[in-house]
Amino acid sequence: MEKLLQWSIANSQGDKEAMARAGQPDPKLLQQLFGGGGPDDPTLMKESMAVIMNPEVDLETKLVAFDNFEMLIENLDNANNIENLKLWEPLLDVLVQTKDEELRAAALSIIGTAVQNNLDSQNNFMKYDNGLRSLIEIASDKTKPLDVRTKAFYALSNLIRNHKDISEKFFKLNGLDCIAPVLSDNTAKPKLKMRAIALLTAYLSSVKIDENIISVLRKDGVIESTIECLSDESNLNIIDRVLSFLSHLISSGIKFNEQELHKLNEGYKHIEPLKDRLNEDDYLAVKYVL
């Protein structure tokens, strides 16, 4: 260690003669000194998953392993390594088979983080049968805890965002059906409603909005329940997201029907006192059609 210290001082001073006298440091010692002696990220990912899948490990330890795994896959390369290390399958096993909702929520959070703005991971996830269907079913299940459903919506939003093919599969699996019940539920927490609107926005930003899609949104009650949020909500974030969604429809050339316009008028009476605290462009864009 003393030799390493002498070399380091000489190196920082640019003293080539002193560096020559000290000689080259031991690479292993350098690695230890600068924290490079531990396992690499892929190894840590595999070790974390082994802990998660071990039936003898207690819940708290598994949740810590999930936290460690998620921190690792915030790195894009590590997220893509989930496929290379064959870790999607055990992760999906936890998602579907676990009886512990905390573990299910942790698995959903990892899925959402891994596929966020990551085309490779989006495609990798879709290689596994029923992965998308499972996310939709969990998001739709009113018996699931708030944290689980919220993270299911988070995972779905990130999975379909900016991906036309996955968005179309989401549509064919009736994924839009999980949105309206949340928005029309007066007991639903604001966080869940915001995630539902985020999913709706992610879908619409990934496909061409046409009359067929609008027809389905009307049939499923999505447009009506979204508009009704303007009358029922005092949460500014939710109101802003609703206005953004409606403005998106308007900019796509969609015309509201008579019933929708009536509900919009009622909603605007409710939010008018809040207008100075809302997104001005969206507020005016929607008001213009009234």
UniProtKB/Swiss-Prot annotation:
Annotated function: Involved in protein translation, propagation of [PSI+] prions, and polyamine tolerance. Functions as a nucleotide exchange factor (NEF), which accelerates the release of ADP, for the cytosolic Hsp70 chaperone SSA1 and the ribosome-associated Hsp70 chaperone SSB1. Required for fully efficient Hsp70-mediated folding of proteins.
One GO BP: regulation of translation
Similarity field: Belongs to the FES1 family.
Per-repeat ranges for ARM: 13-57, 76-116, 120-161, 164-205, 211-251, 253-290
Protein origin, superkingdom: Eukaryota
Localization terms from the record: Cytoplasm
Organism, scientific name: Saccharomyces cerevisiae (strain ATCC 204508 / S288c) (Baker's yeast)
PANTHER family: HSP70-BINDING PROTEIN 1, PROTEIN FOLDING REGULATOR
Name of the protein this chain belongs to: Hsp70 nucleotide exchange factor FES1
Record's miscellaneous remark: Present with 13100 molecules/cell in log phase SD medium.
Modified residues (Phosphoserine): 12
Keywords per UniProt: Cytoplasm, Phosphoprotein, Repeat, Translation regulation
SUPFAM superfamilies for the chain: ARM repeat
One MF annotation (Gene Ontology) recorded for this entry: adenyl-nucleotide exchange factor activity
Pfam families: Fes1
Assembly information from the UniProt record: Interacts with the Hsp70 chaperones SSA1 and SSB1.
Gene3D superfamilies for the chain: Leucine-rich Repeat Variant
